[in-house]
Amino acid sequence: MSFFSRNINSKDRHKIQIISNSTAPSFEPNNEFVTSSCCCCGTILQHPKNISKFRCSVCYVTVVLQGTAFTQDKTELFDLDDMRELLSSCNNTYRELDKDEKRLRKHEVFHLLEDYIATRMVTIFPLNASFESSNPREMLDYDQVKEFYRILMELPTKKPFYSFLVACNELLKRPHVALNTPTPTNPKYKRIGLFRWILIILEVPIFKQTLANAEARCNTPHFRAISYEVLKKAVGYMSCLDEASAKELVHFLKYMQKDIFASKVELVNMYITFHFARILHTIGKETNNGKYSPQLEDFEHSEKLNPSLNQGSAKKLVHTNMNIFFGGIVRPMTSSANSKDILALNYRFSPEDYGNEWHIKTGARLLLCLYVANQSAYKCPVSNFYNTMIDFVDYKRDFELWQDLSKLSASHEKENSGSSGPRYSPVQFTICQCPFLFSLGMKISILEYETRRLMEYSAEQAFLKALDRKQVVDVYLKIRVRREFVTTDSLRSIQNQQKDLKKSLRIEFVNEPGIDAGGLRKEWFLLLTRDLFNPNNGLFVYVPESRLCWFSIMESIEHELLQGEGSSSELYYLFGVVLGLAIYNSTILDLKFPRAFYKKICGEVLSVNDFLELYPETGTNMLKMLEYDGEDFEDIFALTFETCFPDRFDESKIHYRQLCPDGSTQAVTRENKHEYFRLWMDFYLNRSIAPGFESFRNGFFHVIEGNSFRLFGSEELEQLVCGSNEQSLDVSMLRSVTRYQGGFDDNSPVVQWFWEILSEMEYPQQRKLLHFVTGSDRVPATGVTTIPFRISRIRSGADRLPLSHTCFNEICLHEYKDKETLRNKLIIALEESQGYGFR
């Protein structure tokens, strides 16, 4: 067998070993080279054109370019009944042995089961065709797969299970099949059907134990070594699917059981966490060049990667790092016992640490498939995708590099639209490319970082213009309004300051002496949004069946009214600007929109579930119609492609609209009922509100222009705008972060009474207190602990009401004589407080 090696880049280890075609007697060098990507790590490699396979020098997997055709014998498949029969025979023999013989001969007794596995693991096809589900929407019968692993795990000997893992590793290392260009193997699964065997391997139950270094029966050094090898290759293969196969994978993931789906998300996230911990332990080492991959030998002989080898040491690789990082504080630590490299307290992962780390990149790509599936069919909260280790990434540099890579990619595509050659960059991967890994708090930090830069830039430009023109130019966006005309005054002020919307916002209420340090701004947002949702404006409608708000349907004659001062178009534009300013100025709004509203802002595709959330009764009736398949369908429903809706100002007036050309004369039949439902949803979620939503969108993105907004999904945007959706206030957590001034402390009687009263309040009353103190009745998306809550002492006036400084989230309490007096004064203050003035 002949080999060929070639350096692609002299700076690193971009060399590949080309394995000659086994059918060729000799290897003829060819000067014509082509590029192919590794089907495991995704590295782009250059190789001679006339070879059938080569070995990747990064992950050491053999990439097959021209696979061998195999025929599948059904008798070679894994069959649980056959395995149980073999197991029963082995158990009978095992039970007849005495205690000493059981210990000495257990491997021999269960050798039949080991042989059964070995004969079916020569190629990928027996495993690939096993455990089929009767459900056409599922790729695997997960109950059968679970039973298969249970049989192997519960054997008196671990050897059959270990042999299975070794065989899996060999198949992953040398699949003998061209996985880069898969061909359909089953009409049911199409292209993705060739990867079923990898999905079965990913169900191995000890993977999480390996990553977390948990105590378990199969958590010996050899098991950890082989299971890690299997896992990293399996993750790599599933992350490097071609576009068509990836779409098919996402389709099947949408129908996966929720508990299995959540388990996969957890596994891949643990895999990413493991490799960040590994990077931490290799900082400052020559092997940490971004492409080093620990092999079997590393696990078997390294105390660092395999801590159990040093039984006297209390340091466990992953366990230790989880304690360090997940505790929220990075403590100084050394990467090994004899290392002189000590990490700083404020250590952050640099993009150079992980930017070319293929394990993290492939893990993130696989998690992306799961995330996309979750966006279409909600399986788990988006917070399940957050990786806490990512909180210790240098997010500012990652964000800047992400923007640079995006510009470089766009420039490359524009200049080399006809070129298919690979593009090289010092850092090929940033966390911002997979923003679902960032926690919401980190995304808000990135948004605030970019917002602060834009605001400072706008203020700087205003100052420079003032110097050039010798004029006074305000560095703030100042809006001066009257309470009774808050919408009109705000619209006029915004129209006159279109170029200043990215400046820091300052609000002034006419005839009120308050100085805006944050509180007036919150009050303005609250009053303005409340006025915009007034039914008299006709901008939004209340949907009784869901108790949510939605854009009013614009009648055709009103398109003429979409122009001019105070028109619907201008008010929608104003609402968009207000929403953008609220995000820019970190202010929470009380909005009652469905998830579809935030999906449309983020450009996400709407689904049937979005329609059901907004119109649950209508949607349920539609689904019942779709289920009915009787011959008398048209007689029972008697529908046409037409809909009707009330006028937004006069509900007694009804408007009719056709869902398609000549819809009023086209009957809904069994054949076209699905198209009818699709057009119905499209009308109410898109077409009917298009003019108003487009005006809103223009206003919103006139303010929100930065790239950081692209990091947020619809669920996160809703939390960013409206705060946490929790239906209770965690009083103990709020108390733990509260600061005291003026002589109060946590043990002061008045303070203790205050917390007792707050705990006894119902949630609506608690929200009123939050609004009284902070200017908003919603808890921030990042939790109640991020509210800088303060309680101050006022020594005189024990018969007066409590005061608040919403600018500073501060409540001022007098020295009340008892708890009931404080309770009564608080209730009066909460019910009757509005406006700003001297007290």
UniProtKB/Swiss-Prot annotation:
Places the protein is found: Nucleus
InterPro entries assigned: E3A/B/C-like, HECT_dom, Hect_E3_ubiquitin_ligase
Example of a GO cellular component annotation carried by this entry: TRAMP complex
Top EC class of this enzyme: transferase
Active site feature: C807
Reactions accelerated catalytically: S-ubiquitinyl-[E2 ubiquitin-conjugating enzyme]-L-cysteine + [acceptor protein]-L-lysine = [E2 ubiquitin-conjugating enzyme]-L-cysteine + N(6)-ubiquitinyl-[acceptor protein]-L-lysine
Alphabetical GO biological process terms: protein polyubiquitination
Keyword match NAD: no
One term of GO molecular function: ubiquitin protein ligase activity
Pfam families, A to Z: HECT
Organism domain of life: Eukaryota
E.C. designation(s): 2.3.2.26
Chain ranges of the HECT domain: 497-839
Keywords: Nucleus, Transferase, Ubl conjugation pathway
Assembly mode: Component of the TRAMP complex.
Entry's family note: Belongs to the HUL4 family.
Its job: Probable E3 ubiquitin-protein ligase, component of the TRAMP complex which has a poly(A) RNA polymerase activity and is involved in a post-transcriptional quality control mechanism limiting inappropriate expression of genetic information. Polyadenylation is required for the degradative activity of the exosome on several of its nuclear RNA substrates.
Name of the protein: Probable E3 ubiquitin-protein ligase HUL4
Encoding gene per record: HUL4
